């Protein structure tokens, strides 16, 4: 496994919708492993492929609970319910945090590393992290959804 360089804003790859994954091969498995390692070393809870310069619909999420690592390939949100408002940051925007409204519950359809379709239900922080990463895959940045920015001392 390798730690990848995280793309910082501004960069065109962050604002470009990603291509769907067609080839479920060893290159994809390596990308997933490298992304997960990169996310953990950077102390993140999610990482999307465009954040490492790869314009594919691939994301990894791990919020540090017993859900563990979630790999999302070609994900789409089928259902959203409720709302939550809270702080978000992004590894591509170091030191920038803002308040963002997200659905509190989501149901997602995605594929695993072998191409098998699965459904996932999530709520709370996990739902927030997944929505943030899926936005990345469509070229949507969290800064476009911020209702107010936080000073660093507000987050302590």
From Swiss-Prot:
One Gene Ontology term of the molecular function aspect: metal ion binding
- Keyword NADP in the entry? The reply is no
What are the cysteine partners in each disulfide bond? none
Q: Which InterPro entries match?
A: Peptide_deformylase, Peptide_deformylase_sf
Q: Does the keyword Heme apply?
A: no
What the record notes about the co-factor is: Binds 1 Fe(2+) ion.
Q: Which UniProt keywords apply?
A: Hydrolase, Iron, Metal-binding, Protein biosynthesis
Give the EC number: 3.5.1.88
Q: Name one GO biological process term.
A: co-translational protein modification
**Reactions it catalyzes:** N-terminal N-formyl-L-methionyl-[peptide] + H2O = N-terminal L-methionyl-[peptide] + formate
Cofactors required: Fe(2+)
The organism's superkingdom is given as Bacteria
Recorded hits in Gene3D superfamilies, A to Z, give:
Peptide deformylase
Instruction: Tell me which residues this entry annotates as catalytic.
Output: 133
Residue numbers binding Fe cation? 90, 132, 136
According to its UniProt entry, what is the function of this protein? Removes the formyl group from the N-terminal Met of newly synthesized proteins. Requires at least a dipeptide for an efficient rate of reaction. N-terminal L-methionine is a prerequisite for activity but the enzyme has broad specificity at other positions.
Give the family this protein belongs to, as stated in its UniProt record: Belongs to the polypeptide deformylase family.
NCBIfam families in the cross-refs: pept_deformyl (TIGR00079), PRK00150.1-3 (NF001159)
The protein's name: Peptide deformylase 1
Q: Which organism is it from?
A: Bacillus anthracis
Lineage per the UniProt record: Bacteria, Bacillati, Bacillota, Bacilli, Bacillales
């Amino acid at each position: 496994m390798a730690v990848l360089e995280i793309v910082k804003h501004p960069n065109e790859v962050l604002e470009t919708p990603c291509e769907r994954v067609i080839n479920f091969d060893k290159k994809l498995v390596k990308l997933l492993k490298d992304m997960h390692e990169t996310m953990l070393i950077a102390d993140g809870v999610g990482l999307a492929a465009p954040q490492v310069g790869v314009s594919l619909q691939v994301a990894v999420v791990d919020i540090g609970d017993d859900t563990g690592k979630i790999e999302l390939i070609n994900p789409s949100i089928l259902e959203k319910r409720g709302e939550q408002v809270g702080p978000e940051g992004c590894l591509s925007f170091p030191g920038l945090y803002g308040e963002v409204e997200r659905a509190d519950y989501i149901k997602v359809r995605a594929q695993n590393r072998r191409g098998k379709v699965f459904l996932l239900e999530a709520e709370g922080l996990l739902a927030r992290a997944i929505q943030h990463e899926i936005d990345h895959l469509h070229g949507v940045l969290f800064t476009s959804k911020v209702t107010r920015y936080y000073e660093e001392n507000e987050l302590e």
